[in-house]
């Protein structure tokens, strides 16, 4: 998900065990998602090849040191919704159109607004200047929300493609979180947006967040699980890096996730808290 949320929650244990049966050159648990970490604690980051973070929360010195050690920073960039704690909130609030379920501090935004698109590219340039390897592009699912709201989802799709292409042109890798329906439709249209996408990141493929307030997790339904897996396989076939982010404490489910991701050569991170601390 995202978030600079809960300051008072202590970090909880995070899951990731090396699979010694996997061929040596690939380890699926080389990815860490720390989007909720708000201090400058980079302890453990050196153990990961890829980490997703709110890059503004870390010093340039630490970013540079860890990058030199082989850690690649994927900096959070929310292209599809607007959070009320961003310093540009007042400038773009009028372009929002729908509340975001389970995240009361943000609303979906009309990405067709040219000023918004320009801001996303400007922010991405700043992230690159700070040492980002790429961006963790969140809330591309605004495309699906536009469909549900009977808005011009085609225009939303064109706007998303433009943002992706322009950010990739900066020399940044683009890892898109979610957007399964967007990519499904773009594949059907034989669109060239895939040329600008480096990675595909999907949450809750195997797991499901049942209660956002109390970190209660369940199991994803078979239909959605199969759909997410099919999109992930499609992206892999197109040569993209694939990442799963799961939320669970169920040992059987954890093992299933590990086995599946390692067999498919997908990167994965398993957390027992939605805060991703």
Question: What is each model feature region?
Answer:
Residues 6-9:
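Sec-dependent N-terminal signal peptides
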Residues 1-4:
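Positively charged n-region of N-terminal signal peptides that target proteins for export
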């Amino acid at each position: 998900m995202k978030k600079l949320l809960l300051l008072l929650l202590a970090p909880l244990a995070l899951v990731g065990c090396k699979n010694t049966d996997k061929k040596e050159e690939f380890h699926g648990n080389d990815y860490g998602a720390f989007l909720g970490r708000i201090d400058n604690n980079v302890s453990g980051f050196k153990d990961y090849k890829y980490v997703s973070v709110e890059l503004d929360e870390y010093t340039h010195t630490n970013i540079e040191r860890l990058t030199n050690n082989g850690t690649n920073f994927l900096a959070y960039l929310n292209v599809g919704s607007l959070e009320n704690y961003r310093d540009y909130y007042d400038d773009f609030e009028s372009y929002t159109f729908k509340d975001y379920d389970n995240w009361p501090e943000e609303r979906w935004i009309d990405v067709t607004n040219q000023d918004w698109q320009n801001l996303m590219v400007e922010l991405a340039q700043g992230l690159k200047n700070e040492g980002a390897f790429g961006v963790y592009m969140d809330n591309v699912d605004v495309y699906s929300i536009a469909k549900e709201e009977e808005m011009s989802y085609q225009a939303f799709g064109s706007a998303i493609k433009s943002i992706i292409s322009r950010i990739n042109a900066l020399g940044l890798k683009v890892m898109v979180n979610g957007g399964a329906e967007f990519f499904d439709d773009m594949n059907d249209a034989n669109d060239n947006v895939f040329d600008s996408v480096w990675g595909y990141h999907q949450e809750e493929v195997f797991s499901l967040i049942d209660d956002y307030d109390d970190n209660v997790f369940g199991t994803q339904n078979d239909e959605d699980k199969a759909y997410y897996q099919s999109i992930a396989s499609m992206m892999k076939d197109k040569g993209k890096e694939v990442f799963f982010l799961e939320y669970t404490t169920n040992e059987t489910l954890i093992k299933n996730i590990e086995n599946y991701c390692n067999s498919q050569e997908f990167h994965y991170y398993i957390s027992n808290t939605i805060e991703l601390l």
